[in-house]
Amino acid sequence: MKFTKSIREEDVKRDWILIDAKDKVFGRIITEIATILRGKHKPYYTPHVDCGDYVVVINADKVKFSTSKKLEDKYYKHTGYFGNLKEETVEKLLNNNPEKLFKLATRGMLPKTKLGRKMLKKLKVYAGENHPHTAQVKGN
C-alpha cells in the first residue's frame, strides 16, 4: 500500500516571483497571485502547510479592469461605531493606494486563518517599477 507523504514546513523551498501588472486584467492577476502564495503550482502542495512562494508585484497602478468594475465594485470597512460603515470604490483605492487594493483582493482568495495571514505577508506590492527586492528575484 502506498501512502502520500506530506511536506513539512522546513522542507519547503521558496522562490521570489516577479509579476508586472502593467496592462493586465486585475482579476486574473489576483487569481495567479493567490495560487502562487498558496503553493498550488508546486507538485508537493499540502493544504495545511504554507508552501507558497514570495510574490513581488510591480506597476500596480497601471492595472486594467474589465467592464465598469472600477466604478461599481466597493470595499467596505466598519469603524465599530453605529452607522459608520465606510465604503471605497476600486477606482479610489487604485488612485490613492494600489498596494492596499491588491492586498484586499488577494486576502479574499486566501484561507481566513492564521495560515492565510502568514501567506499574505509574502505578497509585496509596489505602484511603480522600482522595488527593493532585486537581489531576491531571479532574472533581475
From Swiss-Prot:
Q: Which GO terms describe its molecular function?
A: mRNA binding; structural constituent of ribosome
What keywords are assigned to this protein? Ribonucleoprotein, Ribosomal protein
Transmembrane region positions?
A: none
- Gene Ontology cellular component terms for the protein in this record: cytosolic large ribosomal subunit
Query: InterPro entries in the record, alphabetically?
Result: Ribosomal_uL13, Ribosomal_uL13_bac-type, Ribosomal_uL13_sf
Give the family, as the similarity comment puts it. Answer: Belongs to the universal ribosomal protein uL13 family.
Role description: This protein is one of the early assembly proteins of the 50S ribosomal subunit, although it is not seen to bind rRNA by itself. It is important during the early stages of 50S assembly.
Self-association or partners: how does it assemble? Part of the 50S ribosomal subunit.
Q: Which NCBIfam families match?
A: rplM_bact
HAMAP family on file? Ribosomal_uL13
Protein name, please? Large ribosomal subunit protein uL13
